Amino acid sequence: SYANIYKYKKAEELYKRGLNIDKNNNHILNNLANLKKELDKTDEAIDIYNKILSKQPNAIAAIYNLANLYNTIGEFEKSKKLFFDILKLRSDLTDADRMISQMTKYDNKNPHFINMKNKLSDMKLTDKSLVYLHFALGKAYDDQKKYDKSFENYKKANDISKKLSKYNFEIDRKKFIKIKDKYNSLGNIQLNKNSRNFLFIIGMPRSGTSLTEQIIS
C-alpha cells in the first residue's frame, strides 16, 4: 500500500475515497487511524479508533492500535486498561501481556503475574504467543529480583523466536564475503582527482550515513 512506502498523502486520499463509498468500513477506518498515528496526528487517530469502537466494541485490531497509541504518548493507565480488555476477549493474545508487563511493577502477589503463570501451565499456546508470554514473565521475575527465573524466561523467549525466524547464518556469511570482495576490488579503480561531482549519501536511520558524510567532508 502507499502507506507502507511512506506516500502518506496518496494513501490518505485513497482511504477517504474508500470511505465515500462505505463510510462505516472499519478496516479502512483502522488504516486511516494508523496513518494519522504515523503522521503524529494523535488526536485525530484517537477519534477514529473510538469511532470504530463505538460501533464495534470488540474490534480487537482497533483496541490494540489505540492501546499502543496511548502507550506511545504516555497514557499508561488507559493503555493498560485496553490491553486488559483484549485479554478478556482473547486470553491467548499474549502480546497484550507483554505490553502490560512493560507498564507494571510486579511482586509475587500481582494478579496479572499469577494469571500469566497459570496461562503458561494451563493453556495450549502457539510458539508466537509463548514468545510474548515468556518475555512478559521475564520482566515480572526481574521486578521481583528473581534473576534466575527471569533469565530462564528470557532465554526461552529468544530460543523460540530464533526458531520462528528461520535465520540462516550461511546466507549472511556469503553476503558479507561478496561485500568484502567488492570492497577489495575498489583498490584497482583509477580515480580522476581533477573532476568534481556532487555526491549524495542515502541511507536508512542509524545506518552510519551521517558518519560517512563527516568523513568524506
Please tell me what each predicted stretch does:
Residues 1-217:
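Alpha-helical solenoid repeat scaffolds of the TPR/TPR-like class and their adjacent stem/linker regions
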